[in-house]
């Protein structure tokens, strides 16, 4: 099962993430947990989230990039749900062996995220990748949709279909 942990503080304003979710929903075996819809008060049901994670084979952290980072509720989710004794540390093996895909949208162009004048995706992904590895997750190459503020509908839809294809290819490779 693919579990998408969706963290968009303003989901009604998102054209890119909305299209990505629409495409993902067309696949069998996909569950979407919209954190800002489930937890507008930031009071995360840790047991429910851990139960959802335990059913998943692929975990996707999908969100818009905000100031070169993740939205605050996703950070809190990571801090609370991936807890000591459950996700890491003595007896913390629950997520071990599962896969993690970082699916992020940006307002900037792809060149904005090349190492040089700006930090590249290899740098920006390091905290998430380190978290994944620490919890025994298999880190997959990230999916990034760039220029989402200026893309036309056709481009956004094409990128959303590419996202769906990534998920489908993972399903086919891991579940025949």
From Swiss-Prot:
An example molecular function term from Gene Ontology annotations: electron transfer activity
Residues where FMN binds: 8, 14-17, 65-68, 105-108
Reactions that this protein is recorded to catalyse: a quinone + NADH + H(+) = a quinol + NAD(+); a quinone + NADPH + H(+) = a quinol + NADP(+)
Membrane protein topology class: Peripheral membrane protein
SUPFAM superfamilies: Flavoproteins
Keywords tagged on the record: Cell inner membrane, Cell membrane, Flavoprotein, FMN, Membrane, NAD, Oxidoreductase
EC number: 1.6.5.2
BP term (GO), one: positive regulation of potassium ion transmembrane transport
Domain of life: Bacteria
Location in the cell: Cell inner membrane
InterPro entries: Flavodoxin_fold, Flavoprotein-like_sf, K_H_efflux_KefF, KefG/KefF
Gene Ontology cellular-component terms listed: plasma membrane
Major location category of this protein: membrane
Role, per record: Regulatory subunit of a potassium efflux system that confers protection against electrophiles. Required for full activity of KefC. Shows redox enzymatic activity, but this enzymatic activity is not required for activation of KefC.
Protein name listed in UniProt: Glutathione-regulated potassium-efflux system ancillary protein KefF
Organism of this sequence: Shigella dysenteriae serotype 1 (strain Sd197)
Lineage, broadest ranks: Bacteria, Pseudomonadati, Pseudomonadota, Gammaproteobacteria, Enterobacterales
């Amino acid at each position: 099962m693919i579990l998408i942990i969706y963290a968009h503080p303003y989901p009604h304003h998102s054209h890119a993430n909305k299209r990505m979710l629409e495409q993902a929903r067309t696949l069998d075996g996909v569950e979407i947990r919209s954190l800002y819809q489930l937890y507008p008060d930031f009071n995360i049901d840790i047991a429910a989230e851990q139960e959802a994670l335990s059913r998943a084979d692929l975990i996707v952290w999908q969100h818009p990039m905000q100031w070169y980072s993740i939205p605050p509720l996703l950070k809190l989710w990571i801090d609370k749900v991936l807890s000591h004794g459950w996700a890491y540390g003595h007896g913390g093996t629950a997520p071990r062996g599962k896969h993690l895909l970082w699916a992020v949208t940006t307002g900037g162009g792809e060149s904005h995220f090349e190492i040089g004048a700006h930090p590249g995706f290899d740098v920006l992904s390091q905290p998430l990748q380190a978290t994944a590895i620490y919890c025994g997750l298999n880190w997959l190459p990230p999916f990034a949709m760039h220029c989402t503020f200026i893309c036309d509908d056709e481009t956004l839809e094409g990128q959303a279909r590419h996202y769906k294809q990534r998920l489908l290819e993972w399903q086919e490779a891991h579940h025949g």
